[in-house]
């Protein structure tokens, strides 16, 4: 029973607890319903003191609500305060309602529906009356402080208002002054406009007056001319009248005076009086008449006045007369005024007459002056016209002479074309004859060799063979001289080889044949000198091709017999568009040609595991090797098979390379050597083959993507008008890979930023471009300091050494008869004229590599010191991504060790993670850039150009004293040479764009931001995502 009672009490308590929790939830749900209104209206700074006094929040909660940065606006702070109070349960709800009742009664009424009673029950329960008094005192003190601060603020605002009022008054006064000034300016502008209009009007009036004056001058001139004519006519009439009067007088005298003649004469005299005299006389008579009438009237008035009591009629008559007198007086005054005006007009007319007479005299003087000037100009014009006639005659003569010269020039061009056709025909005939002669001499030499081998003796020792080899080789190379332009003794000696008609030349040829073939009767292989002599006899080329026979030993290509198609002018022009480099190439390339690798293996049998012979030379010699190490004499075949020899065109092969690319290359090589070029082979076989495969794949696909290539080097200019002048780092788009069936490509130059086509033209294909670059490299004058003859004699045998190679799996003492003749090794060189590239638009932030490497650390620091640069850039560890340098091989031809790059993947991942945030500044070289591109990370490569002008500013960036300008320039230019081999595009900062270190950092930053928005050109095959077949 007690247990059941306790259980019942626990259930009642649990039910009461659950009921209170539900009630609290309902209350808070009501508050949450208007949470958005409370959060916008309440100020947490007013509520927190009361809530702290009620002990529902503490100092930490108050600081979190009011001072934390998590809640920047008041709405967030109010919401956080409400969340804290909800966690306090019922006490928090009651304290929140009392705070609302105390500070925000309208919101209290909204929540509860009751009017606020201004009670502080929570404080009384927690603190008691003392706590409430303390709270109220605190609130009063806070309100007093608020009021005091408000009063201070009001005083400050009033003072500020007075200051602003004074400023406003000053501004109003200034505005009034400006308005007055503006009004004055407006008035002045109006006056100026009125003055301008008046000036224009006066100018128009002046112009009209001038026009009127000119018109009056013309009228005056015409009037003067008319007056002259009239005066002449008057003079003639006067003369005629005088004659008639004389005749009449004679007749009157003869007849006597007629009646009334005197009266008629008087009338005539009266008629001849001028009108003005009549007018004056009339006026005088009228004046006298009026004066007389006036006197009579005055006398009558006096008489009437003297008589008293005059009647009214007389008075009226007197008034009438007085009125008439006044009118007469007025008319008299008018007549006087009219007379005065007439006199003034007469005086003005006289003045005008004098003025016109003066102007007439002036005009006469000007007329005489102008007449003299006109005569002078007429004389000058006549002289100029005479000179022009002479010049026209000379011009006609020059045109006739030019036409004659042009006709002669056209005739000379026609004759030149005819001569060219004749020269081509003669060259074709000569080629046929030389071909026939070559075949006959080859057959003769073959027969002689077979005859001598049939009479063979015992075998010589290896030392004697090697001695004869070196002696014959040195003698042969010392005799290989270049012909004299004027036909000196060298040309005479060469005629013995070509078979001249002179007797002593034939004797010398016979002796040389005996000397050459005296060792061929033995079974031991012939010496190198014998091979050279035989090749020279079989190829009757000019003396300038004396070194081209060496390519059968040092290169992999066996020379074809000399054919007409290769020596014609058309084929020569196709290979050498700028002309044949005959003497220059022969002299400039001889020394470098002998410095290449030379290996001649003389043995009786093939070493185990060795390569099979690839071609059979004359006298049964078997050649093997590739075009990098040179052809190698392997063995001499014996028996009937050794007598077989084809003097036809021999096949050109290279070890390990097949396809149309290598065949085209071999044809070009043969064509170059037949024309006297002895250039070494610098072609990259792997690049050529891969490029050719990518080109064939593009040509087969009709809807393939554009085939973009980048020019790695500046190609030589060509004479073809349709050829493009290609410079380094230019992007080309291939349009036609077999343009007109020639060794040219039809391409379009592309803008690397917008991919728009700029201009079109032809460029040499891959093999042709390599040959042109080889010629350009070999013809540089800087590497030609000494003559080829002295260098040939000194270095021909110094670079040769006799070694005994060991066959694979054979003991050390085997095969004592095998001798290997090898020179010093030469480093590999490879000319890649083009590279297959593709454009990429990288949206992520790309890392930055700064070159030269010696300037990168200080330049990175300067870049980070710029304002707001650390928001865009960050520094990565200054360790090379390429790991350790490649270890040099211990022996020539040994495989190169692979670089050990521990932790490379982690560094790559670190760079990839930082790419999306900021530009990563790296201190890497060219090899590190290749590693990044292989991992599909495309950096922005910025190279700072260093010249002699800015080397001092660059030296200040190093931070290490003791550097000389020459050393710094050499190191920076060395890093610039490495840029051309990078698999991605790069940008250079010219020296003229910056003057000091800070300006350089700003320029570099601007270039980085520009390059981030541009396309990046990457070589196909340089990254893992691109197929390796397109690697060029």
Swiss-Prot record:
One of its GO terms (biological process) is negative regulation of cell migration involved in sprouting angiogenesis. The modification Phosphoserine is found at residue 18. Residues 23-115 form the CARD domain. It holds the Pfam family CARD. Detected in adult heart, kidney and liver; lower levels in intestine, placenta, muscle and lung. Also found in fetal lung, liver and kidney. Scaffold protein that plays an important role in mediating the activation of NF-kappa-B via BCL10 or EGFR. It is linked to Immunodeficiency 89 and autoimmunity: An autosomal recessive disorder characterized by adult onset of recurrent infections, allergies, microcytic anemia, and Crohn disease. This is Caspase recruitment domain-containing protein 10. It comes from Homo sapiens. The lineage of its organism: Eukaryota, Metazoa, Chordata, Craniata, Vertebrata.
